[in-house]
């Protein structure tokens, strides 16, 4: 009997290869919105708007929900992003050469409904969208990062936490 398997590839494509109700638990940290460029066309996290990003992840997690057993759980790690002024294009961190996988990319675009430097609210936008699509939103765990990435901002505290949401497919689940 196979007890574990690691699948590498496009999340939707890999999930579609799995049978219904076959997975006990999913632990994931999808690419954050507008923070990295992995050099792959159509990559998650490079959508034009937060709403498109949330919709795309909702589609992926719809497949996760299909493959989870009724008692299964989803543990979702996600962080927020800040809105830009919209006066510049994308900028690449100069310490990474062009084409390097995972280069840091700051997207400086306006976000409808947000002022420049506002937190967008991605974690809760996604959590509420998943709940609306049928997931049970059971818990929000705050992961305090003891050694967070340094930030050059001088007008707010550094981000030192991320959200880990516990979502379930049904009211009765294995915990």
Language model segments and positions:
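Core catalytic lobe of class I
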Residues: 1-175
